[in-house]
Amino acid sequence: MVVDRKHSSKYPEGFAIHPDLVRDKSYVNMYMHHDGYPQWQGVQIANWLLAGNNGCMDGARLSSKLVHDMYYDSCYLYPSADKIDHEYRYVIWSGDKDKIHVSCWNMYKNECVFVLKPEKIISKYHDDMDYTD
């Protein structure tokens, strides 16, 4: 999901809110048929946001670039995130290029795994894997 950061401001949890609360604000709902755990998909998203200054775009532009850059044969777009059966849901909070954050929710456990800037995701979760730059 890509959601403008302003939509989290009315919640005391901020970016840690349950993603279903802002699913109607998401520019894109993308399902990628592979493991979504933070050590893989979290780091992939962080690497992508930092590459080529991708994180500096508004939500609509960021979403279209995300789909373009991350698309592969087992990638699907859905009209709503609640139609996707997945363990981890990531929200990229757009709207301020200097303060971009990503939240990760474990949908099976119904808990927020993290809310971090891309650099912190990499420093916390990077492992010895064959990531895409």
Cite the ranges covered by each PLM segment.
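Short, extreme N-terminal segment that most often corresponds to the first beta-strand
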Residues: 1-35
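Intrinsically disordered, low-complexity regions of eukaryotic proteins
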Residues: 6, 15, 37, 75, ...
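Intrinsically disordered, low-complexity segments enriched in glycine/proline and serine/threonine
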Residues: 9, 42-44, 90
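Alpha-helical interaction segments
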Residues: 21, 38, 78-81
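Generic ordered-secondary-structure signal
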Residues: 24-31, 36, 86-90, 102-104
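Adenosine ribonucleotide-centric catalytic and binding domains
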Residues: 27-51
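Low-complexity intrinsically disordered segments
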Residues: 46-133
